[in-house]
């Protein structure tokens, strides 16, 4: 199980993980690592939250919010943001399904993708600033949001089909069992409720799961399934929705 954790940490983040820690693990086994997603989100969000706390007293809330969101993007290598941009470029092209998938494969950033990145990043910065001004514990909020975003992404894997013939997302999409889905969501709920006591964390998690489930159904109808890009989009939007639900 520890090998799966290190493999998942290396897969969806840019944190330095020695290859020997996940040595002997086949790529086809990665689907079992989905249950680690909330814990990886907890780590990434915790680092981002610490950066916010350290910078808040020095440069103020707005700049601290800017740098903590920037740090989160750097910690993931922009992996999920790239998926968000590609998904928006494809979906909002209003083309046929096959053409949408082709556009999503294009490495060039389109207008819709650029606008999506600006909107999501700017909204995250504003929401983090507002939450901090309201006295929300930002270390807990950011850690819980990142855990919720990655945990809720399982809703685009379970009982969904892969929209392409090959790709990184094929490791997870359609390969996750009902038990793994329940465990992943359960762990995300536990993280959210422990970090944000009372109903606040639980309510935000419920809102996030509902929104990501609806997103998954809309993408399924439009693209005929999911891709690695749509998983990245779900993670980014899940984080944002969770933070918005805390307001």
UniProtKB/Swiss-Prot annotation:
It is a multi-pass membrane protein. The chain crosses the membrane at residues 34-54, 59-79, 113-133, 138-158, 187-207. Keywords: Cell inner membrane, Cell membrane, Cobalamin biosynthesis, Magnesium, Membrane, Transferase, Transmembrane, Transmembrane helix. It is an enzyme of class 2 (transferase). It catalyses: alpha-ribazole + adenosylcob(III)inamide-GDP = adenosylcob(III)alamin + GMP + H(+); alpha-ribazole 5'-phosphate + adenosylcob(III)inamide-GDP = adenosylcob(III)alamin 5'-phosphate + GMP + H(+). Its cofactor is Mg(2+). Pathway: Cofactor biosynthesis; adenosylcobalamin biosynthesis; adenosylcobalamin from cob(II)yrinate a,c-diamide: step 7/7. One of its GO terms (cellular component) is plasma membrane. It is found in: Cell inner membrane. GO terms for biological process: cobalamin biosynthetic process. Its EC number is 2.7.8.26. One of its GO terms (molecular function) is adenosylcobinamide-GDP ribazoletransferase activity. It comes from the Bacteria. InterPro entries: CobS (IPR003805). NCBIfam families: cobS (TIGR00317). Joins adenosylcobinamide-GDP and alpha-ribazole to generate adenosylcobalamin (Ado-cobalamin). Also synthesizes adenosylcobalamin 5'-phosphate from adenosylcobinamide-GDP and alpha-ribazole 5'-phosphate. Belongs to the CobS family. This is Adenosylcobinamide-GDP ribazoletransferase. It comes from Salmonella paratyphi C (strain RKS4594). The gene is cobS.
